[in-house]
């Protein structure tokens, strides 16, 4: 009986799998968010920020502008829904990969959940709450190191090696797109009326969220085998 007890203590605990359905939250969140800014970008006629009325253009202006004016309830709701669904999905995905060690699992969960937390923060604090809103966007950009670290962790698993390699490559790609966005972004009321910051930010957002969708799809496909 004592030997059996000792043997059980030596066996590492296998994390509880939350199921591929919850894992799809990592895809559902980005899809909802993308549809929101696509549709609302054509609907919005403008908003008032810091007492100044600003006509909206998806070419010139960032997605955050949709969190003000008539589109605010829908866009901010999408920001928050994206955060909640993505975090739930990420937790389910990495708890569903039993080959990962405890530290590696929670490192990946933390790294890939921070951008989702940033999305939720940006839904709670709009563009007029500049500092917390900017902090939320900064959390989104933690995907630059987060993709690389997660990729190296997944590369150690034979069945995830290819995806891990692609995720490592996503890190410098995200950095390039972030630099492109900041190079075209003018954080003034006048600056929102010209330029292509709306396009470059949307390219950055779409690229980041596409990797979350790919991660959820890859995990779900393997889980259903």
Each language-model region and where it sits:
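Transmembrane alpha-helix entry/boundary detector in multi-pass membrane proteins
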Residues: 70-76, 103-108, 127-141
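C-terminal ends of transmembrane alpha-helices
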Residues: 35-45, 117-129, 175-192
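Membrane-proximal helix-loop-helix units in multi-pass membrane proteins
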Residues: 115-156
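Terminal transmembrane helical module of multi-pass membrane proteins
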Residues: 152-225
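N-terminal signal-anchor transmembrane alpha helix
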Residues: 17-47
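Hydrophobic cores of alpha-helical transmembrane segments in multi-pass inner/ER membrane proteins
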Residues: 2, 78-89, 142-150, 204-220
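Internal transmembrane alpha-helix with an interfacial aromatic "cap," most often the third helix
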Residues: 40, 77-106, 148-158, 222
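Interfacial helix-start motif at the membrane-water boundary
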Residues: 61-84
């Amino acid at each position: 009986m004592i030997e059996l007890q000792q043997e059980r203590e030596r066996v590492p605990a296998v994390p509880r799998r939350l199921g591929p359905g919850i894992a799809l939250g990592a895809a559902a969140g980005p899809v909802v968010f993308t549809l929101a800014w696509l549709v609302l970008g054509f609907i919005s006629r403008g908003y008032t920020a810091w007492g100044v009325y600003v006509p909206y253009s998806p070419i010139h202006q960032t997605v955050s502008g949709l969190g003000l004016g008539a589109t605010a309830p829908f866009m901010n709701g999408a920001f928050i829904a994206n955060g909640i669904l993505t975090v739930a999905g990420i937790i389910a995905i990495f708890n569903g990969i039993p080959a990962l060690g405890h530290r590696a699992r929670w490192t990946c969960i933390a790294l890939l959940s921070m951008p989702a937390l940033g999305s939720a923060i940006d839904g709670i604090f709009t563009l007029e709450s500049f500092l917390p809103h900017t902090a939320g966007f900064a959390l989104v950009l933690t995907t630059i190191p987060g993709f690389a670290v997660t990729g190296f962790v997944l590369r150690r698993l034979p069945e995830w090696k290819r995806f891990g390699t692609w995720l490592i490559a996503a890190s410098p790609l995200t950095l390039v797109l972030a630099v492109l966005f900041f190079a075209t972004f003018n954080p003034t009321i006048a600056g929102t009326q010209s330029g292509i910051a709306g396009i470059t930010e949307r390219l950055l957002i779409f690229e980041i969220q596409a990797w979350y969708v790919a991660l959820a799809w890859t995990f779900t496909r393997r889980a259903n085998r």
